[in-house]
Amino acid sequence: MSAAFKELYNTKIVPKLVSDFNYDSVMQVPKLEKIVVNMGVGEAVSNSKLLDQAVEELTLLTGQKPVITKAKKSISNFKLREGQSIGAKVTLRGDRMYYFLEKLVSVALPRVRDFRGVSANAFDGRGNYTLGVKEQIIFPEINIDKVNKVRGMDIIIVTTAQTDAEAKSLLTEFGFPFKK
């Protein structure tokens, strides 16, 4: 596993952000804290095998076993009971986080059909970025022949940045393709 993005962060991105935002200390420079990959499988209410396949796909993508998420409330219209398994999520930190980000930016996002860049409006006001992916087959680890259903996922990139501008410049330096 290469930590090329970690090396890039330490050698190129930190000095550039220090000069751009006039930080007093290198420790003030925003950094990636974690990446959360969440896959909601609403159909798991009626067919629990779908959840197993989602867990398997997330394990392939991230190299880490996902946590199964459960419903917080019962909703009768969706035939959903409290405590029922309805999704899976993985929290990536450290080298696995940098490896996943590198794979996302350089391999997966360019494989999206009609891709013109990701929205720059998906920041939450505290320096975190949320990205929705409509199909899991953009990742090279997923074998298209073995996919029984195209599922989307949410990718949340949590940074230590105080503002959205700092977080955007951090992600831009990592090569995130924002829309112009």
UniProtKB/Swiss-Prot annotation:
InterPro entries: Ribosomal_uL5, Ribosomal_uL5_bac-type, Ribosomal_uL5_C, Ribosomal_uL5_CS, Ribosomal_uL5_dom_sf, Ribosomal_uL5_N. HAMAP family: Ribosomal_uL5_B (MF_01333_B). It comes from the Bacteria. Keywords: Ribonucleoprotein, Ribosomal protein, RNA-binding, rRNA-binding, tRNA-binding. One of its GO terms (cellular component) is ribosome. Pfam families: Ribosomal_L5, Ribosomal_L5_C. Belongs to the universal ribosomal protein uL5 family. PROSITE patterns: RIBOSOMAL_L5. Part of the 50S ribosomal subunit; part of the 5S rRNA/L5/L18/L25 subcomplex. Contacts the 5S rRNA and the P site tRNA. Forms a bridge to the 30S subunit in the 70S ribosome. The keyword Ribosomal protein applies. GO terms for biological process: translation. This is Large ribosomal subunit protein uL5. It comes from Acholeplasma laidlawii (strain PG-8A). Coiled coil: none annotated. This is one of the proteins that bind and probably mediate the attachment of the 5S RNA into the large ribosomal subunit, where it forms part of the central protuberance. In the 70S ribosome it contacts protein S13 of the 30S subunit (bridge B1b), connecting the 2 subunits; this bridge is implicated in subunit movement. Contacts the P site tRNA; the 5S rRNA and some of its associated proteins might help stabilize positioning of ribosome-bound tRNAs. One of its GO terms (molecular function) is tRNA binding.
